[in-house]
């Protein structure tokens, strides 16, 4: 039976600069990941039966489920300063179906000089979670999403704020932003 939707909200304190060397801080980078194939999870746990694993270790969160139909509808990435969205990114949908195998979606958010993040469950929404890291990114931010089947990488997306490219699985640039040129 196919399961519903889960949303991850990644929020991280950051510092960006324009090409004219005037530093413009943005205090939140929120990444919302809409995934089809997982439902009814707690903040963080490991199931010995491998029905569902939600691990968080070293800035990485992984979702593992057996016999799954898993993919993502979209990834919305917002750069926020003083509660105002100053830039937006979107990675389009990807649905990869592999029944009878272990499917894993691994997301990774990297930043220099940040503290250890934590997972938070939103009140009133059992399917929405966040990872928050406090600190400032002086050397850029990188966000990765990987879709893996039986240890075979099926698809990988990378967002860098700094050089600021979004790559598809073939390494081609979908979008280029020169605004945050470190």
From Swiss-Prot:
It is found in: Host endoplasmic reticulum. This is Protein OPG192. InterPro entries: Poxvirus_TNF-rcpt-II_C, Vaccinia_virus_B7/C8. Pfam families: CrmD_SECRET. GO terms for cellular component: host cell endoplasmic reticulum. The keyword Signal applies. Residues 1-16 form the signal peptide. Belongs to the orthopoxvirus OPG192 family. The gene is OPG192. Keywords: Host endoplasmic reticulum, Signal.
């Amino acid at each position: 039976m196919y399961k519903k939707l889960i949303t991850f909200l990644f929020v991280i304190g950051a510092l960006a600069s324009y090409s004219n060397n005037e530093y413009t801080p943005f205090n939140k980078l929120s990444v919302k990941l809409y995934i089809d194939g997982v439902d009814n999870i707690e903040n963080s746990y490991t199931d010995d039966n491998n029905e569902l694993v939600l691990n968080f270790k070293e800035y990485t969160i992984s979702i593992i489920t057996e016999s799954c139909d898993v993919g993502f509808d979209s990834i919305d990435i917002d750069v926020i300063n003083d509660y105002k969205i100053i830039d937006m990114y979107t990675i389009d949908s990807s649905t990869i179906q592999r029944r009878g195998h272990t499917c894993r979606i691994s997301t990774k958010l990297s930043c220099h000089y940040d503290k250890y993040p934590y997972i938070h469950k939103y009140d009133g929404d059992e399917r929405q979670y966040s990872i928050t890291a406090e600190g400032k990114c002086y050397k850029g931010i990188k966000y990765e999403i990987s879709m893996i089947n039986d240890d075979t990488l099926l698809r990988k997306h990378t967002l860098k704020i700094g050089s600021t490219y979004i790559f598809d699985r073939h390494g081609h640039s979908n979008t280029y932003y020169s605004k945050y040129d470190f």
